[in-house]
């Protein structure tokens, strides 16, 4: 399975990931100059926290959002392992929002459904990784992610 890896040392806080996620995934028009005037406003599924750290769904192996959802709206794609929202059955109870350990799941602008990163599963490749100018967001194999995550920081010898 592939996961999104964010290198906080490469992220410059430009918010391109948010901008394009909101435009390409959440807007009706799919055009930036029109999307900013849409009602309800398009809500991106990835967020830049503080100055330079993009946050997105981790697609947890034991996803609390799936367990908490009372009617099966939060689902896992059996082929990709991605957790996604099946919007037609969402009752806006916000149980998934409350239990997400990363604070990634949010109500939509209309407050009718929950929204979260599904890694652009209908596009084939996450738009946030595609548009990141510094390649701070990358799609990598889970094993490579674990290797990188546990690499000791580089040291300077004096």
Predicted regions and their residues:
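Membrane-helix interface segments
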Residues: 80-81
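N-terminal signal-anchor transmembrane alpha helix
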Residues: 12, 18-22
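Glycine-/small-residue-rich active-site loops that bind phosphorylated ligands and cofactors
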Residues: 12-13, 124
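Flanking helices and flexible, charged tails adjoining ferredoxin-like Fe-S electron-transfer domains
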Residues: 1, 5-7, 22, 27-68, ...
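A short, small-residue-rich loop immediately preceding and capping a beta-strand
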Residues: 72
């Amino acid at each position: 399975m592939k996961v999104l890896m964010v290198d906080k040392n490469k992220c410059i806080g430009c918010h391109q990931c948010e901008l394009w996620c909101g435009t390409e995934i959440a807007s009706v028009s799919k055009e930036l100059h029109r999307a900013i005037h849409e009602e309800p406003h398009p809500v991106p599924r990835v967020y830049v926290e503080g100055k330079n750290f993009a946050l997105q769904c981790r697609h947890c192996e034991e996803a609390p959002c799936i367990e908490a959802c009372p009617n099966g709206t939060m689902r896992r794609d059996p082929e990709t392992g991605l957790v996604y929202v099946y919007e037609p059955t969402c009752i806006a109870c916000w149980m998934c929002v409350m239990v997400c350990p990363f604070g990634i799941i949010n109500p939509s602008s209309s407050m009718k459904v929950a929204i979260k990163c599904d890694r652009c599963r209908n596009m084939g490749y996450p738009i946030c990784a595609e548009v990141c100018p510094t390649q701070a967001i990358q799609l990598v194999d889970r094993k490579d992610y674990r290797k990188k995550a546990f690499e000791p920081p580089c040291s300077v010898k004096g």
